[in-house]
Amino acid sequence: MAKVEQVLSLEPQHELKFRGPFTDVVTTNLKLGNPTDRNVCFKVKTTVPRRYCVRPNSGVIDAGASLNVSVMLQPFDYDPNEKSKHKFMVQSMFAPPDTSDMEAVWKEAKPEDLMDSKLRCVFELPAENAKPHDVEINKIIPTSASKTEAPAAAKSLTSPLDDTEVKKVMEECRRLQGEVQRLREESRQLKEEDGLRVRKAMPSNSPVAALAATGKEEGLSARLLALVVLFFIVGVIIGKIAL
């Protein structure tokens, strides 16, 4: 016996499209229309009932009326190979006089009275998720570039400060060199003047003259030593900055 042709109109007719990402519930609508002059019973079936929630999944459509069915795809990890397993079927039949117990109505229905339409599922990914590998590469490359450019940027920001510090240290070094040279000259002159005064004031073999000359020389030597140590420290600082 030939199968009865579906009397309900379906929109869409052949495909249910679900647009991702599929990390949350994705809903699409199926419109069922009854162009006949009789009431029609319907129910919606799927090959993967755990993945979908259909509201309403069954009922009666009055003559000349239509009904929107919400098909809700539950969140899942998208697998392109799995979409061929997701299919829906809209089954219908003309409603009997008594439709108070729809479960009994479907159980008692004869196969030749049943009409059905099949729809396949289509999963669409947004453009930015179409090529996840490319997206990951795009995310990685700018991050790597920013890490590479960061030291250069830091260097360009800090280099003027380093140059200024070096100039200051060099100026201080030159000043200290001049100070050391001046003290050396002063020390030499004092030695000559003290020697002349001591020789004029007392005999050269006098212990007092020897102690006076020694005290002044030690004072100058201490100042010179302090300046030399400071000059050495400045030199070490310059060496570290240059490195």
From Swiss-Prot:
Keywords recorded for this protein, A-Z: Acetylation, Coiled coil, Endoplasmic reticulum, Isopeptide bond, Membrane, Phosphoprotein, Transmembrane, Transmembrane helix, Ubl conjugation, Unfolded protein response
Membrane disposition: Single-pass type IV membrane protein
GO terms (BP aspect): intracellular calcium ion homeostasis; IRE1-mediated unfolded protein response
Keyword Phosphoprotein: yes
Coiled coil: 161-196
Subunit structure of this chain's protein: Homodimer, and heterodimer with VAPA. Interacts with VAMP1 and VAMP2. Interacts (via MSP domain) with ZFYVE27. Interacts with RMDN3. Interacts with KIF5A in a ZFYVE27-dependent manner. Interacts (via MSP domain) with STARD3 (via phospho-FFAT motif). Interacts with STARD3NL (via FFAT motif). Interacts with CERT1. Interacts with PLEKHA3 and SACM1L to form a ternary complex. Interacts with VPS13A (via FFAT motif).
Record-given protein name: Vesicle-associated membrane protein-associated protein B
Lineage: Eukaryota, Metazoa, Chordata, Craniata, Vertebrata
Gene name per UniProt: Vapb
